[in-house]
Amino acid sequence: MKNQIVYEFPLNERMRLFMRLEQLFRQARHFNQGGSVWDCRAVVATLNEIVALLARNDIKSELLKELDRLGGGLGKMQGNQHIDQAALATVLGQIDAAAQRIYGHSGRIGYQVMENELFKSVAQRTAIPGGTCSFDLPGYHFWLERDVERRRNEATEWLDCFHPVQEGIALILGLLRDSAAGIWETAHGGFFQKNLDHAAAVQLLRVAVPIELPYFAEISGSKHRFTVRFLTGLSNERPVQCSEDVPFQLTVCLL
């Protein structure tokens, strides 16, 4: 059982994009393990969100820029006697391999899904509340009612179209989250503020709160400074900032 709740806050648009996609990929993979029609509907709905997000962003360019930045920064550590060179070589190899897989992907990532007639018919109806009923999309209804394994295999093929993106994002965010150790801080009266070195490449803030505390963290900020407020309130009440001192673990992630 976990003993902390972790709140994350990206400090630039690229990291926001990566974290949104990370959540959607996890969500889709989770529901694809289920066998019910409702699980499959959730997979398709999540895939539609992924496609919509990718349509507004050049994900190949964003991933390659970030992988190149990480590779360049970590490459400067080669030969440093204070760095585990074997581990560094492994990470640099992973970065290069992820970049090569994205470079080697011809055309738009996920175009096989975007051009699928069944998927397009569903996507066109998702803006309408309840717009994917059987009387709206009988072909979709037929597909959902077929053999579970066949349906799941097709959904898996769709998800796998985005594998280079999912893999690249997982590598980048994994390295970023592991780039620093957490430090215990105290939010006096439920409030904490700290300046950041704008010359440093701070990409992500992580706030870990003991799970037994009755507060949640609200993070806001920019590359110059950030604020953490601890709020309390039930689901049917407007949250208010607590007046107690709150201990939490802060991780400032940068590479």
UniProtKB/Swiss-Prot annotation:
Signal peptide start and end residues: none
Any Gene Ontology CC annotation: cytoplasm
Family matches, as InterPro entries: ZapD (IPR009777), ZapD_C (IPR027462), ZapD_sf (IPR036268)
Location in the cell: Cytoplasm
Location (main, coarse): cytoplasm
This protein's record includes keyword ATP-binding: no
GO BP annotation list: division septum assembly; FtsZ-dependent cytokinesis
Any single Pfam family the record assigns to this protein: ZapD
UniProt KW keywords: Cell cycle, Cell division, Cytoplasm, Septation
Top-level lineage group: Bacteria
UniProt keyword annotation of Cell cycle present: yes
Function: Cell division factor that enhances FtsZ-ring assembly. Directly interacts with FtsZ and promotes bundling of FtsZ protofilaments, with a reduction in FtsZ GTPase activity.
UniProt similarity note: Belongs to the ZapD family.
Subunit text: Interacts with FtsZ.
Protein name, entry field: Cell division protein ZapD
Organism encoding this protein: Methylococcus capsulatus (strain ATCC 33009 / NCIMB 11132 / Bath)
Designated gene of the protein: zapD
